[in-house]
């Protein structure tokens, strides 16, 4: 049976070109892995609550096996809320994959959060 995927595309600044580029990248990745794309969410700005509810409902009803997005920032929410979304999807049989960050799991997310944390002191930036 062919695996099913949902693509989650988001442009923070509302750029249609960025959305199309992301959609093409994700579609190519799904095709290369022989996944059937069952739904594409395309959003600008902050990820909407309705999209998150749709994802949860689809996961609960086992309508897809993979959620694919460009990177972790696609969720556009605080780390604890993002972790809860990933946890819920995994518990319902969905593997969360990103092109830039790999597979997301509840175990890998804390490291991902720490790697993105930056400290600013005066005009100098520390990673």
What are the roles of these predicted feature ranges?
Residues 1-127:
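Short, structured surface patches at the beginning of a domain
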């Amino acid at each position: 049976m062919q695996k099913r995927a949902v693509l989650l595309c988001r442009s923070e600044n509302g750029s249609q070109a960025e959305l199309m580029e992301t959609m093409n990248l994700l579609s190519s990745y799904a095709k290369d892995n022989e996944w059937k794309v069952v739904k594409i969410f395309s959003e600008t700005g902050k990820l909407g609550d309705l999209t998150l509810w749709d994802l949860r409902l689809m996961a609960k009803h086992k309508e897809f096996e993979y959620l694919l997005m460009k990177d972790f920032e696609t969720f556009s929410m605080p780390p604890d809320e993002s972790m809860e979304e990933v946890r819920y999807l995994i518990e319902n049989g969905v593997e969360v994959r990103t092109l830039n960050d790999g597979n997301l799991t509840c175990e890998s997310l804390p490291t991902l959060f720490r790697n993105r944390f930056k400290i600013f002191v005066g005009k100098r930036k520390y990673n």
